[in-house]
Amino acid sequence: MPKLKTNSSAKKRFKVTSTGKVMVTQSGKRHNMRKRNKRMLLVQKGYTLISKSKMRLMRSVMPYSF
């Protein structure tokens, strides 16, 4: 059986922690930032965890990360 390929766009966008959780950067921070207040910008800073319902999809997209 051949090796499974990892999706290239997924390996650039997602990060898997040592416990197996998948982290993704917050969306909505590319442009039109002046409309948002400072609190909203601080909330969107950093990473967030994906939901458990998306984990099955992530396992098929990045098979060797888990």
Swiss-Prot record:
PROSITE patterns xref list: RIBOSOMAL_L35
Record bears the keyword Ribonucleoprotein: yes
GO CC annotation, single: cytosolic large ribosomal subunit
GO terms assigned for molecular function: structural constituent of ribosome
Keyword field: Ribonucleoprotein, Ribosomal protein
Lineage: superkingdom: Bacteria
Pfam families from the UniProt entry: Ribosomal_L35p (PF01632)
GO biological process, one term: translation
InterPro entries: Ribosomal_bL35, Ribosomal_bL35-like, Ribosomal_bL35_CS, Ribosomal_bL35_sf
Family: Belongs to the bacterial ribosomal protein bL35 family.
Name by which UniProt lists this protein: Large ribosomal subunit protein bL35
UniProt source species: Neorickettsia sennetsu (strain ATCC VR-367 / Miyayama)
